[in-house]
């Protein structure tokens, strides 16, 4: 399981790990997770050729039976030797509610590797008070810190964004808050330390232990502070247009409007899939209010028609997210002559109170 808060780089890391395992001759199955439907992560991973199942409508802990069913479905279809699971970025207590139940109830089917929790280094520097910048309310940060507390391995992703001094300060802050935790710094984009990380989680089993204490009232309030939006947009133009540029400009529109409303972005990610394409997609990410929208996958050729998927998570009212996305789609589309953008599906909501299917206080070796 590769966890971490929204925008930590989980999907990129999952793709890199899946590719590495596949190159070693292993069959890989991926299971993604979201509170809503139409998940960008699923589209990204399927476009890379990985057998992928999606659990929507709740986190793994609340949809535990669906997680097991997804694993069985992948087993029937492609017989994976390794499953990689990516939980919802706003969820915690996954050891007690997911990995321990898997070990206790399905230990004959699955061996559980150490749980990695990724952190975006810039976000982490702000959370630990080392640098100034936008952050979240106290109860949202409760979830963030609980994710780190339950990690078997804390992984500082995107370490290429920090120099040695800043990385050292972050390591020291994590060690002071969570003494004894193993910490790795990696960069999926540049390939830094991926071999060491992947070798560890591919060769070791999660240690036995006791579950951490979690205040579910605070946890539920923290989740409820986050607005969630998923939508799909059908694009049709009279003349082929630059899809990568459109994605970046649309992300910029959303960013500007949310910043004006004082809403902190947790993660915005969008995919554009050309009509009649061969699996190629364009992907743009935005992980903070002051972050420059970044393309993680590009479309080399201009596009005339396609489908846009938008996943937005921010500390803001869901209705505000809906209004911002509608206005931003209209604004970005109007800048492209002859482009028609029709909202096909839009849902915005706050996550419900987490109610785990199981919660085990611990497992023995």
Question: What kind of feature is each model-predicted range?
Answer:
Residues 1-3, 8, 12-142:
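Nucleotide-state-sensitive switch-loop elements of NTP-binding domains
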Residues 1-3, 7-12, 203-365:
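P-loop NTP-binding site
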Residues 26, 76-79, 103, 107, ...:
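Non-catalytic alpha-helical coupling and interface elements of nucleotide-dependent molecular machines
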Residues 30, 183-186, 343-345:
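A structural preference for short, hydrophobic beta-strand core positions in alpha/beta folds
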Residues 59-62, 189-194, 277, 349-353:
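A short acidic, often aromatic-flanked loop/helix-cap motif at beta-alpha or helix-coil junctions
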Residues 90-91, 123-125, 161-162, 240, ...:
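Short acidic, S/G/P-rich loop/turn micro-motifs used as interaction or catalytic elements
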Residues 94-98, 166-170, 242, 321-325:
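Residues at alpha-helix caps and immediate loop-helix transition turns in enzyme cores, especially N-
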Residues 141-223:
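Canonical P-loop GTPase G-domain recognition
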């Amino acid at each position: 399981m590769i966890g971490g808060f929204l925008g930590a780089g989980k999907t990129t890391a999952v793709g890199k790990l899946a590719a590495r395992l596949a190159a070693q001759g292993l069959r890989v199955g991926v299971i993604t997770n979201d509170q809503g439907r139409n998940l960008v992560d699923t589209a990204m991973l399927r476009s890379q050729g990985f057998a992928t199942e999606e659990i929507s409508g709740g986190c793994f802990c609340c949809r535990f039976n669906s997680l097991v069913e997804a694993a069985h479905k992948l087993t029937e279809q492609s017989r994976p030797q390794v499953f990689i699971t990516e939980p919802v970025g706003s969820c915690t207590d996954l050891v007690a509610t997911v990995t321990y139940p898997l070990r206790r109830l399905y230990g004959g089917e699955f061996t559980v590797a150490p749980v990695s929790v990724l952190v975006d280094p810039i976000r982490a520097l702000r959370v630990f008070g080392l640098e100034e910048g936008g952050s979240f309310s106290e109860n949202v940060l409760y979830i963030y810190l609980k994710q780190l507390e339950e990690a078997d391995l804390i992984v500082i992703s995107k370490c290429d964004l920090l120099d040695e001094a800043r990385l050292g300060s972050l390591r020291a802050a994590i060690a002071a808050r969570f003494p004894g935790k193993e910490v790795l710094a990696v960069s999926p984009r540049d390939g830094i330390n991926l071999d060491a990380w992947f070798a560890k989680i591919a060769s070791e089993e999660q240690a036995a232990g006791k579950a951490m204490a979690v205040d579910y009232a605070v946890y539920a309030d923290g989740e409820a502070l986050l607005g969630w939006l998923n939508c799909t947009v059908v694009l049709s133009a009279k003349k082929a247009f630059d899809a990568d540029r459109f994605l970046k400009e649309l992300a910029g529109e959303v960013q500007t409007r949310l910043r004006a409303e004082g809403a902190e972005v947790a993660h915005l990610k969008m995919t554009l899939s050309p009509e009649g394409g061969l699996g190629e997609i364009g992907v743009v990410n935005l992980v903070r209010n002051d972050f420059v929208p970044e393309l993680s996958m590009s479309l080399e050729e201009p596009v005339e028609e396609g489908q846009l998927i938008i996943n937005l998570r921010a500390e803001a009212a869901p209705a505000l997210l809906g209004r911002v996305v509608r206005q931003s789609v209209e604004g970005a589309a109007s800048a492209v002559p002859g482009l028609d953008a029709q909202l096909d599906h839009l849902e915005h909501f706050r996550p419900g109170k987490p109610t785990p299917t199981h919660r085990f206080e611990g497992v023995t070796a």
